[in-house]
């Protein structure tokens, strides 16, 4: 993959560069950024609530949230579409509750890029949840006690103490999410969204152009490396250490 850019480009790559390549890169970037944001939101918040709060069913949710791994993103895609489509599952439920009516115009439609983003987010946030929850579990209780002694509210403790301490775990989870997201083909194909993965698939299997497929894969690696560089630059020289004493 890394040496493919030194090879002579094919006619198909030239055609792709003049037509759809920018579109592929743009779609992949939008989906990646949106999925990273949602998985960060779902994963960190769910890990925080099950780690620091005691509510009915908390022990159940500690393990149930891991089950997002069990369902591939394209299965979420099919289920999401079937539930919200015209005369779909949600329509049947509303009709059963309130009788016949034109409810389709009130039911939101999750298709295209929005559907792909939601499906991948529901499937992949488990990476962030598992690693962040493990980090929260091993955080020293002294940090929390110090924040309380300093008069921090729960919100201030979360943003100033808990979240920064869990940064390495969160970044590791988001890195896995990014690689899974960019390599996904089934979900984006289901929603008819063209990404770099679509270009790789078409280049290799439809046009038998392995070199172009490798060159497109190189773009994916560049995006991942750029994310690592940005994270490392924003972290500066900060180092993170965790006590083995958890809650």
Residue ranges and their predicted role:
Residues 12, 18-19, 185-222:
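Interhelical loop and adjacent transmembrane-helix boundary motif
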Residues 150-152, 164:
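Glycine/proline-centered hinge or cleavage motifs at structural transition points of membrane proteins
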Residues 18, 54-57, 137-142, 152-155, ...:
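Juxtamembrane helix-boundary/capping and inter-helix hinge elements in multi-pass membrane proteins
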Residues 127-130, 160, 198:
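Short alpha-helical elements of helix-turn-helix
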Residues 230-247:
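Alpha-helical transmembrane segments of integral membrane proteins
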Residues 110, 155, 193:
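Residue-level marker of regulatory loop/turn positions in helix-turn-helix DNA-binding domains and
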């Amino acid at each position: 993959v890394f040496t493919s850019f030194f090879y002579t480009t094919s006619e198909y790559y030239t055609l792709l560069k003049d037509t759809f390549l920018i579109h592929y890169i743009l779609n992949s970037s939008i989906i990646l950024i949106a999925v990273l944001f949602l998985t960060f939101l779902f994963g960190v918040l769910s890990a925080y609530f099950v780690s620091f709060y005691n509510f009915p069913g908390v022990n159940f949710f500690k393990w149930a949230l891991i089950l997002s791994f069990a369902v591939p993103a394209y299965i979420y895609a099919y289920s999401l579409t079937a539930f919200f489509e015209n005369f779909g599952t949600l329509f049947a439920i509303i009709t059963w509750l309130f009788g016949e009516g034109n409810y389709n115009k009130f039911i939101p439609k999750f298709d295209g890029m929005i559907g792909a983003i939601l499906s991948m987010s529901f499937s992949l946030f488990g990476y962030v949840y598992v690693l962040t929850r493990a980090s929260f579990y091993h955080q020293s209780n002294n940090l929390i006690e110090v924040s309380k002694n300093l008069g921090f509210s729960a919100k201030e403790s979360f943003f100033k103490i808990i979240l920064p301490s869990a940064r390495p775990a969160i970044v590791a989870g988001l890195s896995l999410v990014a690689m899974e997201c960019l390599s996904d083909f089934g979900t984006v194909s289901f929603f008819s969204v063209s990404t770099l993965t679509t270009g790789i698939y078409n280049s290799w299997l439809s046009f038998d152009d392995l070199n172009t497929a490798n060159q497109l894969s190189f773009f994916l690696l560049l995006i991942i490396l750029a994310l690592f560089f940005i994270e490392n630059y924003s972290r500066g020289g900060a180092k993170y250490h965790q006590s083995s004493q958890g809650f």
